[in-house]
């Protein structure tokens, strides 16, 4: 629910990754293609799509060198551009459909591209680094094809492909959703974090703690927290491991069974053949596919196990802020998920081993984990914990990369006209933000066809979007309602001018 449904035909969605620095000479054009979906299109078709995209990028750079092409609206398609790395471009082409459900916001689609790239870098390193490591492009293709394909599987429900639609306008991909803690619970969490950070002796670890699909604590930077949070909600939390789909989690989970043909994960013969070194440092030639479904399970000791990295191998990730590699250990107790990051350098140097770290967690943190889970469960208000009667809202803190929103079940009660008006409102805000290229305070109010007020307020990096369906309200009544919400739930972060 809430995602624009698209058929699985090749016209519905095309997604490509290409390098502008490659394939500049005649006969070498295929070298620039690093990924293309669907992969069974002819090379001439793929080159045609990428050639058009490259031309648009080159042309728009003449007028805006610092910010090239972002979106092109054609009669039948929308072309969404994202420069993931210098001269490494991702382009999504979506078919325009007369069905009302196929109404989307361009920034929401671009956030899909940004998310899949960020997750890829977290597990495999940057695309440019892989190209420098193996210049033919075979290495990076061998990782991009299965990784993005596994990610796209989450956009399938049955045989229908789903993209973020106007029904998702009160959600914000690329942010984390946090659990509000009472003071006593916060103190218990702080104590637990201290124990986790010291589980590797003198080597400092990092930790991320989740309760259900909400963030409780993190010692990572906001960007790294967003990436690890997204992956945790997709594959690691209790909701992700269960067969059912969480109805209130922001990230929509796929059906659990691959819907994209297996040939989509096979690398087209563009690069060199033969066994390739792994992008994450493995010399076995194994292609790591961390986004595969049903590959994680809970062991007897409470730690999650997987064979994705190989039998008895420990998962690894790369942290953006420090460019440091870590082992990823995940411990689970009831609805509490603890992700512990241990520096690989410490293990390689023989200072400790993974089994020792796990034992330290079990011996030193078990009691604190039980206490934290108990306190969080007692204070937990359930799926509708952040529902505010009479309001349907989205609150975003761009500096902290945190968001909070009305529960999906409550948002679903809004009329279609209200959601469409909200989507249009957010598009106007996106346009203003892109035009100014800097933080801008503003307020926009729109009255929908069904007399619903939809309102946006932006102030000092924070954004508030709201729908008020009381048809009798005047503009003054609506703005007063927003102000009351701001004062009570946002610490007055959105004052009236």
Curated annotation (Swiss-Prot):
Could you mention a single GO BP entry for this protein? vesicle-mediated transport
Source domain of life is Eukaryota
Q: Where is this region: Disordered?
A: 244-284
State one molecular function term (GO): guanyl-nucleotide exchange factor activity
Query: Where's it found, cell-wise?
Result: Endosome; Prevacuolar compartment
Q: Indicate whether Ribonucleoprotein appears among the record's keywords.
A: no
Per the record, its GO cellular-component terms are: Mon1-Ccz1 complex
Pfam families reported in the protein's UniProt record: Intu_longin_1 (PF19031)
- Protease: is it a keyword of this entry? no
Q: Which UniProt keywords apply?
A: Endosome, Guanine-nucleotide releasing factor
Subunit structure and binding partners: Interacts with MON1.
What function does this protein fulfil?
A: Plays an important role in membrane trafficking through the secretory apparatus. In complex with MON1, acts as a guanine exchange factor (GEF) for RABG3F of the RAB7 protein family. Promotes the exchange of GDP to GTP, converting RABG3F from an inactive GDP-bound form into an active GTP-bound form. The RABG3F active form is involved in protein trafficking from prevacuolar compartments (PVCs) to vacuoles. May serve as a linker between Rab5 and Rab7 protein families in PVCs and mediate PVC maturation.
Return the similarity comment: Belongs to the CCZ1 family.
This chain belongs to the protein called Vacuolar fusion protein CCZ1 homolog B
* Lineage summary: Eukaryota, Viridiplantae, Streptophyta, Embryophyta, Tracheophyta
């Amino acid at each position: 629910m809430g995602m624009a449904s698209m058929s699985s035909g090749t016209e519905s969605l095309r997604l490509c990754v290409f390098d502008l620095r490659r394939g500049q000479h005649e006969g070498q054009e295929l070298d620039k293609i690093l990924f293309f979906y669907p992969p069974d299109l002819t090379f001439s078709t793929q080159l045609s799509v990428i050639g058009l995209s490259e031309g648009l990028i080159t042309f728009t750079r003449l007028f805006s060198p610092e910010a090239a092409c972002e979106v092109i609206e054609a009669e039948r398609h929308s072309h969404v551009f994202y420069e993931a790395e210098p001269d490494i471009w991702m382009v999504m082409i979506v078919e325009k459909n007369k069905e009302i459900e196929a109404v989307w916001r361009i920034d929401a689609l671009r956030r899909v591209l940004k998310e899949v790239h960020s997750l890829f870098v977290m597990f495999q390193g940057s695309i440019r680094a892989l190209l420098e490591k193996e210049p033919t492009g075979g290495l990076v293709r061998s990782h991009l094809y299965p990784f993005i394909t596994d990610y796209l599987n989450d956009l399938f429900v049955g045989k229908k492909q789903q993209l973020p639609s106007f029904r998702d306008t009160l959600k914000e991909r690329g942010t984390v959703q946090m659990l509000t803690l009472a003071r006593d619970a916060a103190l218990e969490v702080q104590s637990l974090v201290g124990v986790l950070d010291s589980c590797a002796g003198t080597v400092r670890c990092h930790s991320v703690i989740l309760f259900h699909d909400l963030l409780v604590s993190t010692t990572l930077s906001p960007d790294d927290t967003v990436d690890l949070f997204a992956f945790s909600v997709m594959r690691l939390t209790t909701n992700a491991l269960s067969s059912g789909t969480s109805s209130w989690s922001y990230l929509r989970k796929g059906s659990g069974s691959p819907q994209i043909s297996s040939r989509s994960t096979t690398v087209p013969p563009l690069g060199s053949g033969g066994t390739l070194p792994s992008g994450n440092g493995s010399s076995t030639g194994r292609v790591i596919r961390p986004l595969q479904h049903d590959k994680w399970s809970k062991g007897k000791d409470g730690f999650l196990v997987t064979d994705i990295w190989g039998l008895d191998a420990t998962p690894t990730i790369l942290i953006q802020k420090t460019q440091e590699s870590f082992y990823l250990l995940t411990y689970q107790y009831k609805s509490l998920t603890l992700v512990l990051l241990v520096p690989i350098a410490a293990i390689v140097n023989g200072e400790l081993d993974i089994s020792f770290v796990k034992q330290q967690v079990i011996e030193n943190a078990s009691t604190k984990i039980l206490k934290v889970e108990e306190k969080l469960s007692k204070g937990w208000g359930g799926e509708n914990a952040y529902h505010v009667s009479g309001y349907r809202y989205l609150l975003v803190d761009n500096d902290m990369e945190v968001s909070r929103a009305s529960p999906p079940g409550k948002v679903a009660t809004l009329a279609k006209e209200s959601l469409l008006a909200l989507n249009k409102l957010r598009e106007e805000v996106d346009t203003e933000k892109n035009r100014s290229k800097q933080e801008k305070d503003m307020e926009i109010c729109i009255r929908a066809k069904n007399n619903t007020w939809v309102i946006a307020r932006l102030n000092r990096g924070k954004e508030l979007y709201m729908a008020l369906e009381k048809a009798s309200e005047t503009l003054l009544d609506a703005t007063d309602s927003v102000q009351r919400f701001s004062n009570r739930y946002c610490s007055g972060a959105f004052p009236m001018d």
